[in-house]
From Swiss-Prot:
This is Glycerol kinase. One of its GO terms (cellular component) is cytosol. Inhibited by fructose 1,6-bisphosphate (FBP). It comes from Coxiella burnetii (strain RSA 493 / Nine Mile phase I). Its EC number is 2.7.1.30. Key enzyme in the regulation of glycerol uptake and metabolism. Catalyzes the phosphorylation of glycerol to yield sn-glycerol 3-phosphate. It is an enzyme of class 2 (transferase).
């Protein structure tokens, strides 16, 4: 009997295929790095074909390396980088343009102009839970339709399909038979009404986007179709799709209201489970869908930071201050502090709670005594300070946070997590499986395939790897954070756009 689950985690800088057994234990994984393109300042793109090729390669290789066949796989689940936008031809399957990444800021002027119109901003926030920011898919779709010759006319004729990465991969896996997405990914487009759980005609009119572009929206556990026989040699049922941050929340067993997880990958994403309540933040966080099962919605409150692990990659690649990403841990711990240096990594603007798309990165406090170790440490500390920004916002919105569950590639850095616990003043628990997005996807795919009976049964399998407890003097904590706030204040643009009503 087939009992293995294949989870795909398609991320910003890499694609992973991870095998789990029926007890949700990680059996084997394979990953492939993918290319990001930066054709202009603030523009971030991917090659959709490379995303697909890397996904198929990972699936084939992980099966071969684990000495398994596709027939051994009971279910396949997909998690993905959210908001990243792809339009393709329904007849040929060819992408119309590169995938516009979630970090892309090219539509900032359009978003500002739209937000300045009377009543638009309040209506958008009420319907979507989001803000009018280039982060979300709606303005990216609009840009492609307006700037690629013939795109709008083809869309009006029903010849084009839109999808976030999950939808595009599903189309490719099923040989074009299924054009669908899930509720979590739909909720990040800026076109989905999270109150009514449907595409919103008024929002489509606002952005002048033909409804024929859009995929069908399904629950996170659903029958999404089967992989095409020619791809893996056997038809595997696709039983789950979910955005990567929501997948991580499920993988971290954050299924009860009040539970919080934070994922540290390219960016940092903190998600609070708010149960069946939509909480419109008073502190610039996003209302979103955490998951939807059996037509029942669980909502979340999310803070999004654009640059976390990407700051370490910046230290490695253009600056060559480190050779490998994991060098950052030893270098940060080799100095007592940053020597007064603060890095504000606003390379693509600042996300929550500032939402300033025009802010740009800055280093403060440099002296002749500044060493590269100080800058490396400042980059890691910046991730933790930004996390404290989010925690303060969550607390001010009424949550009670005593423990934070963390995952993602950066969570392997012990120094980072200890400093995180210190600066937050709360316990930090690292999951035994730091591939929480893949684990959550496997949980849901297994549920959809009947391998698990309930969400509670699955998440009962969650285990902590290590607990980090605050050790920093509270006065020192406040001094360091005060320095961060002053650095951010100097980085913000004088006339940051009004993104909230």
């Amino acid at each position: 009997m087939s009992s293995f689950i294949l989870a795909i985690d398609q991320g910003t800088t890499s694609t992973r295929a991870i095998l789990f057994n029926e007890e949700a234990k990680l059996v084997h994984y394979h990953h492939v790095e993918i290319t990001q393109y930066f054709p202009q300042g603030g523009w971030v793109e991917h090659d959709p074909e490379e995303i697909w090729d890397s996904t198929l390669l990972c699936c084939r290789n992980v099966l071969e390396e684990a000495s398994l066949r596709a027939a051994d796989i009971a279910a396949l689940g997909i998690s993905n980088q959210r908001e990243t936008t792809i339009l393709w031809d329904r007849h040929t399957g060819q992408p119309l343009y590169r995938a516009i990444g979630w970090q892309d800021r090219r539509t900032v002027n359009f978003c500002e102009q739209l937000a300045s119109q009377a009543g638009v901003l309040a209506k958008f926030v009420e319907k979507t839970g989001l803000i009018l920011d280039p982060y979300f898919s709606c303005s990216k779709i609009k840009w492609i339709l307006d700037n690629i010759k013939g795109a709008y006319e083809k869309a009006k004729r029903g010849e084009l399909a839109f999808g976030t990465v999950d939808s595009y991969l599903l189309w490719k896996f099923t040989g074009g038979k299924c054009h669908a997405t899930d509720a979590t990914n739909a909720s990040r487009t800026g076109l989905f009404n999270i109150n009514q759980q449907r595409w919103d005609d008024e929002l489509l009119t606002l952005f002048d986007i033909p409804k024929s572009l859009l995929p069908t929206v399904l629950d996170n556990c659903a029958q999404f179709g089967f992989t095409d026989l020619d791809l893996l040699g056997h038809k595997i049922p696709i039983t789950a799709m979910i955005g990567d941050q929501q997948a991580a929340a499920v993988g971290q067993a954050c299924i009860k209201p009040g539970m919080v997880k934070s994922t540290y990958g390219t960016g940092c994403f903190m998600l609070l489970n708010t149960g069946d309540q939509i909480i419109h933040s008073r502190n610039r966080l996003l209302a979103t869908i955490a998951y939807r099962l059996n037509d029942t919605v669980t909502y979340g409150l999310e803070g999004s930071i654009f640059i976390a692990g990407a700051a370490v990659k910046w230290l490695r690649d253009p600056l060559h201050l480190i050779e490998k990403a994991n060098d950052s841990e030893s270098m940060a711990s080799s100095v007592e502090d940053t020597g007064g240096v603060y890095l504000v990594p606003a390379f693509t603007g600042l996300g929550a709670p500032y939402w300033d798309p025009n802010a740009r990165g800055a280093l403060f406090g440099l002296t002749r005594n500044t060493q590269r170790e100080h800058i490396v440490r400042a980059a890691l500390e910046a991730v933790c300070y930004q996390s404290k920004d989010l925690v303060r916002a969550i607390l001010n919105d009424g949550a009670n946070l005593t423990t934070l569950r963390v995952d993602g590639g950066m969570a392997a850095n012990n120094w980072l997590l200890q400093f995180l616990s210190d600066i937050l003043g709360v316990n930090v628990d690292r999951s035994r499986c730091i591939e929480s997005s893949a684990l959550g996807t496997a949980f849901l795919a297994g549920l959809g395939a009947g391998l698990f009976d309930s969400l509670e049964e699955m998440t009962g399998l969650w285990q902590a790897d290590r607990h980090f407890i605050p050790q920093m003097d509270p006065k020192k904590r406040e001094e360091l954070y005060d320095g961060w706030q002053k650095a951010v204040e100097k980085t913000l643009t004088p006339a940051a756009p009004l993104l909230f009503p």
